[in-house]
Amino acid sequence: MSEVARLRHPDTIRRQSERMLALATQGRLEMWDINLGRLPDLGRMVGELTRVRYPDLAVPMHGRRLHFRVGDVDLWENRPRPADRDEAARSDVGLIVVSVLLDAGSGPRWRYTDTEIQGELSRSEGLAVASFRAWERGVFSSRGLPRVDSEALSGVGAASLAQAFQVREDNPLVGTEDRAALLRSLGRVSSRWPSQRVGGLFDLLSGHASSTGRLSAVTLLRTLLEQLSPLWPDSTMRDGQHLGDVWPYPPLGLMPFHKLTQWLAYSLIEPLHAAGITVTEVDRLTPLAEYRNGGLLIDGGVLTPVTPGWRTTSHPLSSSLVVEWRALTVALVVRLAELVREDLGARLSMAQILEGGTWAAGRRLAAAARPDARPPVNVASNGTIF
């Protein structure tokens, strides 16, 4: 296996994160103290929240389409959809891909209002609804249809994205220009896909499925990373290829996370299933190294930064504090998931644990700790990775 292939494999994410946890338990990390004794209480809390949210424990898989449902309004269930199964899959894949890529942290001040949904929306739900409405209006289509094609994406500017997302001086969205640039890059990449549409990714993925319609989650992730790696031109390179969400960490080498691409992989499982493709080995994917899961561990008392002034400092994604935090998040959520399963007496998948779950618990603790529910660590993000 080449170095690039190894760094795109979820087993490498898990293995490197376990190595980071080993350093933490030995007291050898520069930026964090760890208290594993807090994990059981946190496991019970996540279990209790999961029971409240899903009393029958029929927990759906973590995925973007759940953010299209706000209160009694379910945009996903009522979306425009072609009658042909494969064409419907292309439509769904296009929507999911563009919405996930626009899902990096919005910042604490941004809000979105929708005519059908009461109240102001923010963060993931706000970004989801905003991207859905833009898709519905044909913002991402050269034909004015609710689809996503290369030609339209290649021309997306910051102004048009700002208009679609209701961005103003008093309603700033983190990284609006960078998000627009990301969509333009997606336009260039998807020009090589079938039909020059983002939905053509469905055809590429279905080509990797077996004759019985089975597709390994490892293959799903690898294919996504191979196709989407040009979207992150400023990332670390190996063998002439951009690695994306992979960061140097001298004590352990390169640390891969692929948070946004794994979030996309989780989010595509249901649309692929509806098209007759069963994604297998889903638990080979890892917990997502993002600020809700990671914030749960800080606000829950498992992790404590040791650097004075860490709360008031903006930390780059490449910083030791953030790289250590994200790796510990992956390894510790794996352990937390086992405690949640024991508490519930149910063998939920990792995707169900995240949904049930750790993401919601992280948001709840953040809201209790800080008025705007912002994450405990201020990460300097450009809105395209974290």
Q: Where in the sequence are the language-model features?
A:
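Non-transmembrane, amphipathic alpha-helical segments
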Residues: 82-89, 93, 209-216, 253, ...
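Hydrophobic/aromatic-lined pockets within catalytic cores
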Residues: 98, 102-106, 225, 229-233, ...
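Short coil/turn segments at secondary-structure boundaries
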Residues: 110-114, 236-242, 351-352
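C-terminal structured domains
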Residues: 251-386
